C-alpha cells in the first residue's frame, strides 16, 4: 500500500496573485492536509473518510480523487485497478488549497504505486489541470507548493512550471479558518475585468520587490512588500471580520497579514513565538465563527507532499 500526505497551502501570499504560493504545516505536528492511500485491487473503488467527508460530492465520479485516477490512467495508457481511500481533513472552500491537497495526494499516490512512470513536471502539469476543473481555470499557486514544498513562484516558461523562492526560516505563519465557505469561482468573479495603470505598476513593484528581498535576505523589507492591490480590496467584502483582524495584526505586531488564497482563511506573519501566540489567541476569540473553524501556528512546509509509513 502507498499513502501520501499533501499539506495545506497559501495561494497568492498577498503579493503574487496566481503566481506565488506557500506550503505550510503546524508547528505542533498536526497534519493540516489530506491523505490518499492506494492499494492493489481487482476493480477500482474509492472510500472517503476524514473530518470533512460530509462536504464531498455524493456522486463518486464528481469526486476529484476519482478524476485523478481516471486522468492518470489515461496518461499512462492503461487502467490500473486499485482501492483508493481519501482522508478529507481539509475544509472545502477554505482558502487553504483544499482541492489541491486532494489532487496532489491522489496523483502522487497513483504515481508512486505505479513506480513513478511520470516525471515531476508532467505530474505537476496534471495537478494543475485537475485542480482547474474545480476552480474554473488552471493555476498552480496551490498545487505547486503543496507538491514541491516551500515558497513557489510560477514561471511556466522553458518547460519549468515553478521554482522555489528562498524564504525566512524564523517566520511563523498564523493561519485562521473561520469555519465558513468561500468558493474560488465566486471570489474570482468579484474581481474587476480591468485594472488602473497605477495598480498594475504597484503590483509589479510589490511582487518584484518581495522576490528581490527574499533572495537578498531582507525579511523586514519582504514583509513590508507583502501587499495585495489585485484581489484583497475586492474580496474583503466576502470575509466578515477581516478588516478588524488586519487592524489587530498591526497592533499585536505581526509583520504582515493577508487573505490565504480566495479566503476565508487569513494568515499573519510573525517573527517570534510570543507575537504568534498573541495573534493566534486574538483570532481564536474574534475571527472564528463556528466550531468548524481553527487556528494553527505554522512554518513553511519545505518537504511538500510525502509518503507516510
UniProtKB/Swiss-Prot annotation:
Q: Name one GO molecular function term.
A: ATP binding
| Locations listed in the record | Cytoplasm
Per UniProt, ATP binds at 91-101
For this protein, the record's HAMAP family field holds: Homoser_kinase (MF_00384)
Broad enzyme group? transferase
**E.C. numbers:** 2.7.1.39
Q: Which UniProt keywords apply?
A: Amino-acid biosynthesis, ATP-binding, Cytoplasm, Kinase, Nucleotide-binding, Threonine biosynthesis, Transferase
NCBIfam families per UniProt: PRK01212.1-4 (NF002288), thrB (TIGR00191)
Look up the record and name the pathway of this protein: Amino-acid biosynthesis; L-threonine biosynthesis; L-threonine from L-aspartate: step 4/5
This chain belongs to which protein, by name? Homoserine kinase
Q: Name one GO biological process term.
A: threonine biosynthetic process
Q: Which cysteines are joined by disulfide bonds?
A: none
Q: Which reaction does it catalyse?
A: L-homoserine + ATP = O-phospho-L-homoserine + ADP + H(+)
Q: Name one GO cellular component term.
A: cytoplasm
* InterPro entries documented for this protein: GHMP_kinase_C_dom, GHMP_kinase_C_sf, GHMP_kinase_N_dom, GHMP_knse_ATP-bd_CS, Homoserine_kinase, Ribosomal_Su5_D2-typ_SF, Ribsml_uS5_D2-typ_fold_subgr
- The organism's place on the tree of life at top rank: Bacteria
* Annotated organism of origin: Serratia marcescens
Provide the function of this protein.
Catalyzes the ATP-dependent phosphorylation of L-homoserine to L-homoserine phosphate.
Which family does the UniProt entry place this protein in?
Belongs to the GHMP kinase family. Homoserine kinase subfamily.
